[in-house]
C-alpha cells in the first residue's frame, strides 16, 4: 500500500468530544484508510499540514450491528489514527484538507 496518495490515506478528521480533549495534549484524531500503515499516516500528515509528527497510534473501531426496517445490517469498520504533534505545532481541523 505504499502507492496510496496522501489524500487517500487521510479520510477525514474525527471531531468528537474525546478528540477535542486530546487536542489539549497536542494530539489530532483522523479517520484513515483501513490499509494505511503508521509510516504512511505520518508522511501524509507531515506533507499535507506541514507539521512535525512525534507519534502515531492507531485503532480499528468495529462496525455496529444496526436494524433498518426490520432488516439487520452492519456498519463498516473504521480505522482511526491519533497523531501526536511536536511541541509548538498545531493543526486547525476546522479548515479541512
Curated annotation (Swiss-Prot):
<keyword id="KW-0694">RNA-binding</keyword>
<dbReference type="InterPro" id="IPR012677">
    <property type="entry name" value="Nucleotide-bd_a/b_plait_sf"/>
</dbReference>
<comment type="subunit">
    <text>Part of the 50S ribosomal subunit. Contacts protein L29, and trigger factor when it is bound to the ribosome.</text>
</comment>
<dbReference type="InterPro" id="IPR013025">
    <property type="entry name" value="Ribosomal_uL23-like"/>
</dbReference>
<comment type="similarity">
    <text>Belongs to the universal ribosomal protein uL23 family.</text>
</comment>
<keyword id="KW-0687">Ribonucleoprotein</keyword>
<comment type="function">
    <text>One of the early assembly proteins it binds 23S rRNA. One of the proteins that surrounds the polypeptide exit tunnel on the outside of the ribosome. Forms the main docking site for trigger factor binding to the ribosome.</text>
</comment>
<dbReference type="Pfam" id="PF00276">
    <property type="entry name" value="Ribosomal_L23"/>
</dbReference>
<keyword id="KW-0689">Ribosomal protein</keyword>
<dbReference type="InterPro" id="IPR012678">
    <property type="entry name" value="Ribosomal_uL23/eL15/eS24_sf"/>
</dbReference>
<dbReference type="GO" id="GO:0006412">
    <property type="term" value="P:translation"/>
</dbReference>
<dbReference type="GO" id="GO:0019843">
    <property type="term" value="F:rRNA binding"/>
</dbReference>
<dbReference type="GO" id="GO:0003735">
    <property type="term" value="F:structural constituent of ribosome"/>
</dbReference>
<dbReference type="GO" id="GO:0005840">
    <property type="term" value="C:ribosome"/>
</dbReference>
<protein>
    <recommendedName>
        <fullName>Large ribosomal subunit protein uL23</fullName>
    </recommendedName>
</protein>
<dbReference type="GO" id="GO:1990904">
    <property type="term" value="C:ribonucleoprotein complex"/>
</dbReference>
<keyword id="KW-0699">rRNA-binding</keyword>
Amino acid at each position: 500500500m505504499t502507492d496510496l496518495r496522501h489524500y487517500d490515506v487521510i479520510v477525514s478528521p474525527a471531531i468528537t468530544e474525546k478528540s477535542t480533549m486530546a487536542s489539549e495534549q497536542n494530539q489530532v484524531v483522523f479517520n484513515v484508510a483501513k490499509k494505511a500503515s503508521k509510516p504512511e499516516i505520518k508522511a501524509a500528515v507531515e506533507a499535507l499540514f506541514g507539521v512535525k509528527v512525534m507519534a502515531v497510534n492507531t485503532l480499528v473501531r468495529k462496525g455496529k450491528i444496526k436494524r433498518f426496517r426490520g432488516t439487520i445490517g452492519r456498519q463498516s469498520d473504521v480505522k482511526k489514527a491519533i497523531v501526536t504533534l511536536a511541541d509548538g505545532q498545531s493543526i486547525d481541523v476546522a479548515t479541512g484538507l
